[in-house]
């Protein structure tokens, strides 16, 4: 019994917010160093996951107790293919999330996604060469 993918939103061209990082604007303005450190740690985690398969599988095995090696392998392959090397926030994903949220909270449809979207931290880290430096090692 292996990993059974029921649907691939990417293959169908459906934008879906599956992995998001959210914080308050107040936090980003009062403690930008913390936000940057968090994002760098996240990016290092993505790097390790994508480049150290054995370590990644060991962590998955620990937390997905009882999963067969086949399921772990297939999950790893699927996840690495879907995971962005540079996790820029996507206006399209945020808009899609607001659309889904509007089914339960109609006022979400009125929210301007630009008001809750900030790529400046990821852009600054990316432009600093931090991410490229990880993958050069």
Predicted segments with their positions:
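Periplasmic-binding protein-like
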Residues: 1-28, 39, 75-78, 119-126
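Generic alpha-helical propensity signal that fires on short helical segments
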Residues: 21-24, 46, 129-134
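Secondary-structure end/capping motifs
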Residues: 30-111
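Conserved C-terminal helix/tail region of periplasmic/extracytoplasmic solute-binding proteins
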Residues: 102-137
């Amino acid at each position: 019994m292996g990993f059974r993918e029921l649907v691939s939103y990417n293959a169908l061209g459906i934008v879906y917010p599956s992995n998001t990082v959210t914080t308050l604007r107040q936090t980003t303005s009062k403690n930008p160093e913390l936000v940057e450190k968090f994002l760098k740690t996240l990016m290092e985690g993505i790097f390790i996951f994508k480049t150290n398969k054995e370590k990644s599988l060991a962590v998955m095995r620990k937390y997905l107790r009882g999963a067969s090696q086949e399921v772990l392998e297939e999950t790893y392959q699927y996840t690495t293919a879907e995971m962005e090397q540079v996790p820029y926030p996507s206006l399209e994903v945020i808009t899609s999330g607001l659309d889904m949220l509007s089914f339960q909270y109609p006022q979400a449809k009125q929210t301007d996604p630009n008001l809750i979207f900030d790529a400046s931290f990821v852009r600054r880290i990316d432009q600093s060469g931090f991410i490229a430096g990880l993958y050069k090692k």
